[in-house]
């Protein structure tokens, strides 16, 4: 299982349509289907069931989605925290001054 599979699963669950999810994820629909099939094989359960042209989460899919949403939320929180920490310890500051006045203060 990898992080991309979790993102893919979340998007398919949200849109309930492989083609639309693949388009939004900028991957081919066969690649998306293969990724979800590999995830289902690894978990040993079916995450989706077909309903006409659309798909629906199975009971296992619904339970797994709760965990995936939590995992992805935690990753976003961690990313934001790291960006915030990195931003507070470095950056760019522009300082302007009037030379005659600054000469007496900066020595």
Regions found by a protein language model. Give the residues of each.
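The N-cap/first-turn positions of alpha helices
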Residues: 2-5, 29, 61, 68
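N-terminal winged-helix
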Residues: 30, 80, 84-107
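A short LG(V/I)-centered, amphipathic sequence patch enriched
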Residues: 40-60, 79
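Helix-turn-helix DNA-binding elements, focusing on the entry/boundary residues of the two helices
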Residues: 17-18, 36, 50
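Residues within the DNA-recognition helix of helix-turn-helix
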Residues: 28, 35-38
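Short helix-boundary/capping micro-motifs
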Residues: 10-31
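Hydrophobic residues on short alpha-helical segments
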Residues: 6-13, 58, 65
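Alpha-helical linker/hinge and terminal dimerization helices associated
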Residues: 42-43, 64-86
């Amino acid at each position: 299982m990898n992080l991309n599979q979790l993102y893919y699963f979340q998007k398919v669950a949200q849109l309930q349509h492989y083609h639309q999810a693949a388009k939004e994820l900028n991957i081919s629909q066969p690649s998306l289907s293969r990724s979800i099939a590999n995830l289902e094989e690894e978990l040993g359960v079916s995450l989706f069931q077909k309903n006409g042209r659309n798909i629906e989460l199975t009971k296992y899919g619904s339970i797994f989605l709760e965990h995936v949403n939590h995992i992805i939320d935690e990753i976003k929180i961690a990313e934001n925290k790291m960006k915030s920490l990195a931003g507070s310890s470095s950056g760019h500051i522009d300082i302007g001054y009037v030379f005659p006045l600054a000469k007496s203060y900066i020595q």
